[in-house]
């Protein structure tokens, strides 16, 4: 009995410690719907998945800690469906939620282009109605899995000049199983068969987690992926842009938090001596206190 009591007290102490660390970490929720969907987590699931169908299942499994969205406020987490928009060797995999019987809302889109026989690039872009602005995330380039990208052509080996606009050293995702799958000759574009109140039998909605519980679960995804400000996959983005789907319900319900985010997040860019570009980004917390300030310097070559 004494051993059981000690184990119980130890478990309670550990739980309290985890909760306290999350609350005292200084990381505040933005109040945006995007707080509850991990773009980095979605990319990790896509990297693991064997196909778009498998990817859809992975992002909707509770224990994978990718999705915690409740866009319509019904108290249950939403099911995220995947729809592949294809034009030749360009793919735009749309991640979308059925908000009601008549409305859908795009959460993000994974844009993919094949740039060579054994080269492909991708980015995931969070929707501005969900994240307050377009948030672009891509795999971090790694030695042996990266190549120089020059707006559509590829060159092996590093290059210090490949840094402006679409050019750069990017991760090659050609060996990801799901990427190979969608470029197979027999592939038929995946269009999720599920819709409002019609979901797969394996999926059961759960109650959304509170921020202090949810956030520690998703931070583990952030290291292999980076947030960038450059659209590299421009052909896929051009295909997706006119097909973007938004919901009036989501826009109305979250308009205040989205507008507040856009007002409090300021960006200042100016050009210094020698053509040096300096960008300063300031984000203010919901309580009006300064959350963070980042300055990026890019020198013209």
Identify what each model region corresponds to:
Residues 99-274:
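Low-complexity segments
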Residues 38-61:
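Extracellular/luminal recognition modules and glycoprotein regions
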Residues 58-68, 92-97:
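N-terminal post-signal-peptidase region of extra-cytosolic proteins
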Residues 24-44:
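Short N-terminal segments immediately surrounding and downstream of signal-peptide cleavage
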Residues 87-88, 109:
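Beta-strand-dominated extracellular/periplasmic modules and repeats
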Residues 1-4, 9, 259-301:
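Extracytoplasmic low-complexity, disordered linker/stalk tracts in cell-surface/secreted proteins
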Residues 1-24, 208:
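Bacterial Sec-dependent N-terminal signal peptides
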Residues 67-79:
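Acidic, glycine-anchored loop motifs typical of Ca2+
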């Amino acid at each position: 009995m004494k051993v059981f009591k000690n184990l119980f007290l130890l478990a309670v102490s550990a739980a309290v410690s985890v909760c306290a660390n999350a609350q005292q970490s200084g990381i505040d929720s933005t109040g945006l719907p995007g707080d509850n969907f991990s773009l980095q987590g979605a990319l990790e699931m896509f990297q693991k998945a064997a196909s778009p169908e498998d990817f859809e299942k992975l992002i909707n499994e509770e224990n994978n800690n990718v999705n915690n969205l409740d866009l319509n406020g019904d108290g249950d987490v939403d099911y995220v469906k995947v729809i592949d928009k294809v034009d030749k060797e360009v793919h735009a995999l749309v991640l979308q939620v059925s908000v009601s019987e008549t409305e859908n809302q795009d959460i993000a889109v994974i844009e993919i282009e094949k740039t060579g026989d054994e080269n492909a690039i991708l980015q995931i872009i969070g929707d501005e109605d969900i994240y307050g602005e377009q948030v672009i995330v891509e795999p971090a380039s790694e030695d042996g899995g990266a190549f120089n990208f020059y707006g559509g052509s590829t060159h092996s080996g590093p290059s210090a000049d490949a840094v402006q606009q679409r050019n750069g050293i990017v991760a090659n995702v050609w060996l990801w199983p799901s990427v190979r799958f969608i470029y197979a000759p027999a592939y038929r574009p995946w269009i999720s068969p599920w819709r409002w109140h019609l979901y797969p039998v394996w999926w059961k909605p759960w109650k959304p987690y509170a921020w202090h519980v949810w956030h520690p679960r998703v931070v583990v995804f952030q290291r292999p992926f980076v947030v960038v400000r450059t659209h590299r996959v421009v052909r896929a983005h051009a295909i997706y842009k006119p097909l973007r789907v938004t919901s009036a319900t989501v826009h109305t319900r979250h308009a205040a938090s989205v507008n507040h985010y856009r007002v409090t997040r300021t960006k200042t860019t100016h050009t210094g001596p020698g053509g040096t570009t300096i960008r300063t980004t300031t984000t203010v917390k919901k309580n009006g206190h300064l959350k963070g300030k980042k300055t990026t310097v890019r020198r013209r070559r």
